[in-house]
UniProtKB/Swiss-Prot annotation:
Native species: Rattus norvegicus (Rat)
Protein's recorded name: Acyl-protein thioesterase 2
Any one GO BP annotation for this protein: fatty acid metabolic process
Pfam family, one: Abhydrolase_2
Name of the gene this protein is made from: Lypla2
Lipid attachment, kind S-palmitoyl cysteine: 2
Amino acid sequence: MCGNNMSVPLLTDAATVSGAERETAAVIFLHGLGDTGHSWADALSTIRLPHVKYICPHAPRIPVTLNMKMVMPSWFDLMGLSPDAPEDEAGIKKAAENIKALIEHEMKNGIPANRIVLGGFSQGGALSLYTALTCPHPLAGIVALSCWLPLHRNFPQAANGSAKDLAILQCHGELDPMVPVRFGALTAEKLRTVVTPARVQFKTYPGVMHSSCPQEMAAVKEFLEKLLPPV
């Protein structure tokens, strides 16, 4: 890869899965609270497409209010996990700018915005939704797993005009004790006011808690195959 990674801090030690062929598309995937990019790089490598590069950055370590101010990998501070919980607006916006810098780095290296999918799990999925909806570049789509839309009251007004064409795959475990599936359903409703409603898929998985499952990963692979075909 050409270009200077030093100007994009999240790229310097990100876990990546390189394409087996010439890379013509990219998936940027953001992990959940307390995790690192390595676990999702491993998971995505099991469904990899040969022409796609997968980039899984690591969140900075910060004190998290929800976890008694313990320092852990977190994209922004979390005060609670409910639709009415107070939110770290400045932290969310700063994190989104850092992800946009990563997107722009890939664009400078020859991958067009419409060949980039942003995704994530839990807090990472939340950040991927907020970032893609407010991004000035028209991305291909979003993979949003077990998550919610941060600062949801700001939408649809906060969305960039190009966001209406985004394809969104939203998946949720029906027994999720951390981010209840009802919160996911409310998020899907809100997303349909921001993007073309038919472009939002909301899939739920019986018996699944706050985690992924093989059926969900198969759905992610199918979604990526449709959005990012070989060129």
